[in-house]
Amino acid sequence: MATKLIVIAFLCAALIAVVQSAPQYAQGEEPTYDEDDDEPIKPHSSADPDASYEEFDPSQLTEYANTAQDPGRRPHFLEQANSNNGDQLPSQSDSSSESTEH
């Protein structure tokens, strides 16, 4: 009985899949498409293609920006930070002795 229900459910699912994949127009009828050839083509970029490169000022690239230091690019910054933190934090031997006393 259970196998019959499984087979019927599978056949219903297959029928639904076939019906949904069928074209949505009758046989012999040609599908119609929107004729939008008269619309102008829009560029993908928002940049003005008529703008010249002379407006670009390369001296702006050398101006300093007030941003945080990147430790990944400045390993000496990491060394300085580690030496400063080492003075403030207790050593590992101190923390291990404290945990055994409790």
From Swiss-Prot:
Keyword Membrane: no
Entries under Pfam families matching the protein: Anophelin
Biased composition (Low complexity): 91-102
Subcellular location, record wording: Secreted
Keywords: Secreted, Signal
Compositional bias of kind Polar residues: 59-69, 80-90
Protein's job: Salivary protein with anticoagulant activity that inhibits host thrombin (F2).
Similarity annotation: Belongs to the anophelin family.
Name of the protein this chain belongs to: Salivary thrombin inhibitor anophelin
